[in-house]
Amino acid sequence: MEDIYELYSRGCALLADGHHHQAAVPLSRARDLSPQSASIREALGRALFHTQRFREAAAEFQAVVDQAPTNDYALFCLGRCLQLLGRHAEARVPLAMAASLCPKRTDYALYRDRAAAAVEPAHAKPDDH
């Protein structure tokens, strides 16, 4: 049986070196062995995000948020995944929460505002002229 810490460490090293596809392999194994570990799931979410597997990444970040509802980074990443899946209305809540938790993070506010702007035209009423 593989050691969870070894898998996690190897995955994080690959992630740090920009080898996102390769990082997903040991991180997925580590997650399967320790599904309750927020740090493993966050790292796996990052690897999946960078390989444009946004649906899978969103599931990992959602698992982190379920355990730690005030984890601003996981909220932000969840929101970004939802945006990139075209689910702007759903992205608004986690992005707004992340921006509220860390008001100095201008990137959080930027993507929160973009999600809101993407939704607004869909809800705008046509002029009665």
Question: Where do the PLM segments sit?
Answer:
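Mid-chain, well-packed structural core segment of small domains
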Residues: 62-84
